[in-house]
């Protein structure tokens, strides 16, 4: 379950996208640095990737983050981020 701050970031990304993204748009990325808010005494870089599937009126929000001590998930692109949360709006 996402923390309160994480839930707010996901909702903010979704609301911003609702106002600015046409139905068939590609992914948009939001970069946020949130020191101490998601994890005490930590500086975590997070990226919310918001997609608006052409099939209909909902947004998919994936929140990725990097920080030491978390085993990264390897992607085919070689990116080593950790997906923290996923929500649909």
Swiss-Prot record:
<keyword id="KW-0929">Antimicrobial</keyword>
<keyword id="KW-0295">Fungicide</keyword>
<feature type="signal peptide">
    <location>
        <begin position="1"/>
        <end position="26"/>
    </location>
</feature>
<dbReference type="GO" id="GO:0050832">
    <property type="term" value="P:defense response to fungus"/>
</dbReference>
<dbReference type="GO" id="GO:0050830">
    <property type="term" value="P:defense response to Gram-positive bacterium"/>
</dbReference>
<keyword id="KW-0044">Antibiotic</keyword>
<dbReference type="GO" id="GO:0050829">
    <property type="term" value="P:defense response to Gram-negative bacterium"/>
</dbReference>
<protein>
    <recommendedName>
        <fullName>Ixosin-B</fullName>
    </recommendedName>
</protein>
<feature type="compositionally biased region" description="Basic and acidic residues">
    <location>
        <begin position="76"/>
        <end position="89"/>
    </location>
</feature>
<comment type="function">
    <text>Has antifungal activity against C.albicans. Has antibacterial activity against the Gram-positive bacterium S.aureus and the Gram-negative bacterium E.coli. Lacks hemolytic activity against rabbit erythrocytes.</text>
</comment>
<feature type="propeptide">
    <location>
        <begin position="27"/>
        <end position="57"/>
    </location>
</feature>
<keyword id="KW-0732">Signal</keyword>
<dbReference type="GO" id="GO:0031640">
    <property type="term" value="P:killing of cells of another organism"/>
</dbReference>
<feature type="region of interest" description="Disordered">
    <location>
        <begin position="68"/>
        <end position="89"/>
    </location>
</feature>
């Amino acid at each position: 379950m996402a923390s309160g701050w994480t839930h707010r970031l996901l909702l903010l990304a979704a609301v911003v996208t609702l106002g600015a993204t046409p139905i068939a748009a590609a992914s948009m990325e939001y970069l946020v640095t949130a020191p101490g808010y998601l994890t005490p005494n930590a500086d975590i870089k997070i990226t919310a990737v918001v997609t608006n599937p052409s099939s209909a009126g909902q947004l998919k929000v994936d929140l990725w983050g990097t920080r030491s001590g978390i085993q990264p998930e390897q992607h085919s692109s070689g990116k080593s981020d950790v997906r923290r949360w996923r929500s649909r709006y």
